[in-house]
A protein has these predicted regions:
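Terminal low-complexity/charged segments
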Residues: 1-179
Length: 179
């Protein structure tokens, strides 16, 4: 591993200002020298300001992902992870959401490609994305409960491409029960 981790010092300092606590900022480089910087934001109110810092640095949004902090043990405790690339360096920030009312502000006005990511969060996990310019569903019928896939389909089924028939049978079965 290299001794000096590359990255834009101004971006690192600006994102670090939205973090608090030990381990909230983490820097690493892999065996090939690819640098990445991780930031745990103190709250959802820091998502748009952090995205603005990255927009100003000409970052490219790579992906927004969600995971369950509880590991499925105590109910759904969502956390979002935003991944950006500023030529050659990855900047990621995470933010924990309220388990009872998961909501996050939209960054689609800053990064147009956040549109689908944020709509998936709403559709599949029932995470409210405040201020999204087009909150329509992408894939699932509007009659299905929002976030249905969070509880209806085991992760092993959802992740196994060979079982996509099982996935859709579960979704359609839930819809038939509602009718």
């Amino acid at each position: 591993m290299q001794d000096v981790i590359t990255g834009d010092a101004a971006v690192i300092d600006a994102l670090s200002a939205f973090c608090a606590g030990e381990g909230a900022v983490y820097h690493k480089a892999d065996q090939y020298g690819n640098a990445s910087h991780w930031f745990r934001l103190t709250g959802t109110d820091k998502v748009v300001p952090a995205a603005k810092v990255l927009k100003k640095a000409a970052a490219r949004l790579i992906m927004i992902s969600s995971y369950d902090r509880s590991g499925g043990l105590t109910g759904f405790e969502p956390e979002l992870c935003y991944h950006f690339e500023v030529p050659g360096v990855i900047y990621s920030f995470t933010v924990a959401l309220d388990a009872k009312n998961p909501a996050v502000p939209s960054i689609t006005p800053l990064f147009a490609n956040a549109d689908w990511h944020e709509r998936e969060l709403r559709e599949l996990l029932n995470i409210k994305v405040d201020g999204h310019p087009n909150p329509n569903r992408l894939f699932l019928d509007e009659t299905l409960d929002a976030g249905k896939l969070r509880s209806a389909v085991p992760l092993s089924v959802a992740m196994n491409g060979a079982n996509s028939t099982d996935l859709w049978e579960t979704i359609l079965g839930a819809k038939e029960k509602q009718a």
